[in-house]
Amino acid sequence: AKLSTEDLLEQFKGLTLIELSEFVKAFEETFEVGAAAPV
């Protein structure tokens, strides 16, 4: 299912900072990018 930007932001609002950092790490591993890389 494709989420809109608003849906994603609502999901992130419910996360803790630890959960967010874990998500970013998993995202980088999945897409082989760094957080500073343009998407």
Curated annotation (Swiss-Prot):
Belongs to the bacterial ribosomal protein bL12 family. The lineage of its organism: Bacteria, Bacillati, Actinomycetota, Actinomycetes, Micrococcales. One of its GO terms (molecular function) is structural constituent of ribosome. Homodimer. Part of the ribosomal stalk of the 50S ribosomal subunit. Forms a multimeric L10(L12)X complex, where L10 forms an elongated spine to which 2 to 4 L12 dimers bind in a sequential fashion. Binds GTP-bound translation factors. Forms part of the ribosomal stalk which helps the ribosome interact with GTP-bound translation factors. Is thus essential for accurate translation. This is Large ribosomal subunit protein bL12. The keyword Secreted does not apply. Pfam families: Ribosomal_L12_N (PF16320). It comes from Arthrobacter glacialis.
